[in-house]
Swiss-Prot record:
NCBIfam families the UniProt entry points to: ndhI, NuoI, PRK05888.1-3
The protein, known as: NAD(P)H-quinone oxidoreductase subunit I
Organism field: Prochlorococcus marinus (strain SARG / CCMP1375 / SS120)
EC number: 7.1.1.-
Family affiliation: Belongs to the complex I 23 kDa subunit family.
InterPro entries: 4Fe4S_Fe-S-bd, 4Fe4S_Fe_S_CS, NADH_quinone_OxRdtase_chainI, NDHI
Length: 219
């Protein structure tokens, strides 16, 4: 008889414990239900990279002096600088420059220590390819002008996940009806146009006032 009641007590204890853990899981679920959605519908939606994002490296052939500083400061000696010595001018002549982005860790040392600023970091991060050999960019591919996420009209950049208002550290703390942080390029252009038009109207008003003053003084 005592064994029967002991089994009932153990079963009740396990049931209470299971219910407790179930409620804890539901509490986490309900907490996430009240949060803002963070799913990015890539590639139709993209995050705006930060201002100092280290993306694809941009290279300017005309500025390079083949000093190979980028090779020495690279942790894996990645950049390949092909040059020959000109016996007449006794200077290096650059033939080719390449970086393999399949191996690059995007540390930015080459950009930081370049004496002529021929290297710069862009905000391009879509470098995936089917063939890893296609990730070996030569000076022509590196010299291609970088593309911006905000310049693609088919993409809606998610500003609230890229920049948060001052003092906000968690994007889930923002109310659902709050305005997004930052502005789209189109909104910035409209704002600049309105500002210029208002400025021109103010200038015209000042000119009219000054002309009236001159006429009054002449009379």
């Amino acid at each position: 008889m005592g064994t029967f009641f002991q089994k009932i007590a153990d079963y009740s204890k396990d049931a209470v414990s299971a219910g407790k853990y179930l409620l804890q899981g539901l509490a986490v679920t309900f907490d996430h239900m009240r949060r803002r959605p963070i799913t990015v519908q890539y590639p139709y939606e993209k995050l705006i990279p930060s201002e100092r994002y280290r993306g694809r490296i941009h290279y300017e052939f005309d500025k390079c002096i083949a000093c190979e500083v980028c090779v020495r400061v690279c942790p894996i000696n990645l950049p390949v600088v092909d040059w020959v010595m000109n016996k007449e001018t006794k200077k290096k002549e650059l033939r080719n420059y390449s970086i393999d982005f399949g191996v690059c860790i995007f540390c930015g040392n080459c950009v930081e220590y370049c004496p002529t600023n021929c290297l710069s970091m862009t905000e391009e991060y879509e470098l995936a390819a089917f063939d890893r050999h296609s990730l070996n960019f030569d000076n022509v591919a590196l010299g291609r002008l970088p593309t911006s996420v905000t310049s693609d009209p088919s993409v809606m950049p998610l500003r609230e996940l890229g920049y948060l208002p001052e003092g906000v550290m968690d994007p889930h703390e923002l109310p659902k009806d709050s305005s997004r942080a930052g502005k789209l390029p189109i909104e910035i252009m409209d704002w600049m146009k309105n500002k210029e038009s208002n400025k021109s109207e103010d200038n015209n008003l000042d000119i009219n006032i000054n002309s009236l003053k001159v006429e009054k003084d002449s009379k």
